Amino acid sequence: MVELKEPLATLWRGKDAFAEVKKLNGEVFRELETRRTLRFELSGKSYFLKWHKGTTLKEIIKNLLSLRMPVLGADREWHAIHRLSDVGVDTMKGIGFGEKGLNPLTRASFIITEDLTPTISLEDYCADWAVNPPDIRVKRMLIARVATMVRKMHTAGINHRDCYICHFLLHLPFTGREDELKISVIDLHRAQIRAKVPRRWRDKDLIGLYFSSMNIGLTQRDIWRFMKVYFGMPLRKILSLEQNLLNMASVKAERIKERTQRKGL
């Protein structure tokens, strides 16, 4: 299966898309055993290629033992991008997708997306907030926007699995005006898509966001503000219905921190 949009639909018409993908050269961002991420130029524009080369038996067994479906190709990200676009969540724009092969160990697939530039990750944008607090209006605006995006994502049946502020890109220029605010969520290759997001996967995304925001100087009031927008209900009701989430957020965020430090990430 191959699906191409412009300009690839014209440039690669009548050609083997997989052969064309293999010819692409550029800046390698990540090189793993089963996945390669490359930024390249085409007709004066910048794009990203993610090339998946099946998976390993070890990875399949590890995921199945954890009751998770392993990532077998680029299809998850392609479908997640389109589902998010349908529900009004800004994300990457996919212009090319292809997959071939039935054996999960050898299946090949690719996804090509437009390079979102100029942008800055929220991790970098907020990096000095703890020592150089932002305009309170801007901070509240960003908190509300991310909360709305994550709520829409979960309502659409998608959980990210790597839901950290580094995967939310703020489009530039941004001078603090709400009418110019645009944030796109990226890196959806591990996303899961269902009719409804199970509570435990919803909580994993929320705890991931909390963990990745721990060092940017957010106050307890900022966290409550996020939760009120995300859950769409008064704080008193959230505290009653979501006590389990609140109890385990700090504990699990600390575990993520320890695991991240152990892996040297």
UniProtKB/Swiss-Prot annotation:
Keyword terms: ATP-binding, Kinase, Lipopolysaccharide biosynthesis, Magnesium, Nucleotide-binding, Transferase
Catalytic activity: an L-alpha-D-Hep-(1->3)-L-alpha-D-Hep-(1->5)-[alpha-Kdo-(2->4)]-alpha-Kdo-(2->6)-lipid A + ATP = an L-alpha-D-Hep-(1->3)-4-O-phospho-L-alpha-D-Hep-(1->5)-[alpha-Kdo-(2->4)]-alpha-Kdo-(2->6)-lipid A + ADP + H(+); L-alpha-D-Hep-(1->3)-L-alpha-D-Hep-(1->5)-[alpha-Kdo-(2->4)]-alpha-Kdo-(2->6)-lipid A (E. coli) + ATP = L-alpha-D-Hep-(1->3)-4-O-phospho-L-alpha-D-Hep-(1->5)-[alpha-Kdo-(2->4)]-alpha-Kdo-(2->6)-lipid A (E. coli) + ADP + H(+)
Cystines in this chain: none
Taxonomy, superkingdom: Bacteria
Stored SUPFAM superfamilies: Protein kinase-like (PK-like)
GO annotation terms (biological process): carbohydrate phosphorylation; lipopolysaccharide core region biosynthetic process
An example Gene Ontology molecular-function term: kinase activity
Cofactor(s) recorded in Swiss-Prot or TrEMBL: Mg(2+)
EC number: 2.7.1.235
InterPro entries for the chain: Kinase-like_dom_sf, Lsacc_core_hep_kinase_RfaP
Pathway stated in the Swiss-Prot or TrEMBL entry: Bacterial outer membrane biogenesis; LPS core biosynthesis
The protein's enzyme class: transferase
Keyword Nucleotide-binding included in the entry's annotation: yes
Active site: D162
Protein family membership: Belongs to the protein kinase superfamily. KdkA/RfaP family.
Matches recorded under NCBIfam families: PRK15123.1 (NF011703)
Function description: Kinase involved in the biosynthesis of the core oligosaccharide region of lipopolysaccharide (LPS). Catalyzes the phosphorylation of heptose I (HepI), the first heptose added to the Kdo2-lipid A module.
Name of the protein in its database record: Lipopolysaccharide core heptose(I) kinase WaaP
Taxonomic lineage from the root: Bacteria, Pseudomonadati, Pseudomonadota, Gammaproteobacteria, Enterobacterales
